[in-house]
Amino acid sequence: MKSDSEGHKSSSKIQIHKGKILLKPRSWVNLGYSIANSEKETFFLKNAIPGETVDTVLLKRSGSLFWGVASEIQEVSSERIPSDCSIFPRCGGCSYRHVSYQKELEIKKFLLQETLEHFLSKKHIQIPEIEILSGDPNGYRNTAQIQLGFAGNQRLAGFYEEFSHSIVNLPEEGCKNLPQEMNFAFAEFLKQEVKGSKQILKSKTLSFRLEGTKVISYKKKSVSFSENIRIPELKRIVWEIPAGGFSQVNRYLIAPWLEKIFELVPNNQNRILELYCGSGLIAIALKSKTTSWLGYEISSDCVQQAKRNVLLNGISSCDFKTLNLETDWIDSEEVLNSSFWIMNPPRAGLSKKVLQTLIKTSPNGFLYSSCNHTTLVRDLSLFLNKDYKLSNVTLVDFFPRTKHFEVIVKVEKKD
């Protein structure tokens, strides 16, 4: 694949075909787009494969940057496949239903590699071969939220259109990313609403979570999960998440993700510090790595749940505290006594305070898991120096067919 930096000189004048712009994208770029150029403009295209010639409907502009969707394909790539979803590419949820899943993984690996090289090459940081963890690309989500609205008297229920707050109704067969139980629950709710047996929902969203085969309200009820994981021997772990609490959404990859983290974290740590610890899932899986575990999380409900979760698994030597990592400093004594860090921040990445503390403290190593590879690599570029090496990069495709993916990296001090 060509990198984003290649091919700029091949730009040309804009051509109009049947009232639409005719473009030839040259490379894949982040967020599920391919990129095309004219003499003065840059175009980010959905539903277009590099090398194709496509008629494009423009949806958004910012200066000389344009975003659009390929509506007709004039020259078709051999990599294109028919979409298995009737509302792609209108729906803003998925980005890769016009290529095979294997090709999607190849694209995501290419984008991650390019981002790593862009940020780290000037520091002469050696980048290890990227590993990939993936599972079934269909029916994987254990949590979902659909948008609700009306067009006149007609009920709308689905996902937002690309670059819009217009709702694209779910197909009759439901969303490919959702389990059948969840698709049925959404359809049944709307059917009962039409019949009048359910009050018309005034909320703009409807959210569910899957507990086994049972669908429950995301915001109103806590949920229990269990998994068999090899850490290293096979063990069954259980955990609960409070109503509205965060959880990894791919039900097929939670165990492989935890097993990979277990593999990467060194044994016999005096203390592990976990930031953005959620409801304590990683601590449950990795407690054998250390005699002491300290986790920080902004949500007091999640902290209380984390304390209950470790007890559910017979673990007593873990401590969890409520702390806003965006605005508050971590207690220095506790940090200095932690030989290894684990961080799983939101998409925005590490806060300035966390990053400054990490640089100042210089632990023996850390593991960073993120659903935004650009902020992850940005943070790495600010921390990595001659004393540290990047020893593992693993792409975990938590979000098949969409523009997102998870990345785990391990950083450790050089010998």
From Swiss-Prot:
PROSITE patterns the record matches: SAM_MT_RNA_M5U, TRMA_1
Any matching Pfam family: tRNA_U5-meth_tr
Protein family: Belongs to the class I-like SAM-binding methyltransferase superfamily. RNA M5U methyltransferase family.
Any GO BP annotation: rRNA base methylation
Keyword terms: 4Fe-4S, Iron, Iron-sulfur, Metal-binding, Methyltransferase, S-adenosyl-L-methionine, Transferase
Binding site for [4Fe-4S] cluster: 85, 91, 94, 175
Annotated InterPro entries: MeTrfase_TrmA_AS, NA-bd_OB-fold, SAM-dependent_MTases_sf, U5_MeTrfase_fam
Binding site for S-adenosyl-L-methionine: 248, 276, 297, 344
SUPFAM superfamilies noted in UniProt: S-adenosyl-L-methionine-dependent methyltransferases
Gene3D superfamilies in the record: 2.40.50.1070, Nucleic acid-binding proteins (2.40.50.140), Vaccinia Virus protein VP39 (3.40.50.150)
GO molecular function: 4 iron, 4 sulfur cluster binding; metal ion binding; rRNA (uridine-C5-)-methyltransferase activity
Source species, domain of life: Bacteria
Family matches, as PANTHER family: RNA M5U METHYLTRANSFERASE, TRNA (URACIL(54)-C(5))-METHYLTRANSFERASE
Organism of provenance: Leptospira interrogans serogroup Icterohaemorrhagiae serovar Lai (strain 56601)
Active site: 371 (nucleophile)
The protein's name in its UniProt record: Uncharacterized RNA methyltransferase LA_0098
Entry EC number(s): 2.1.1.-
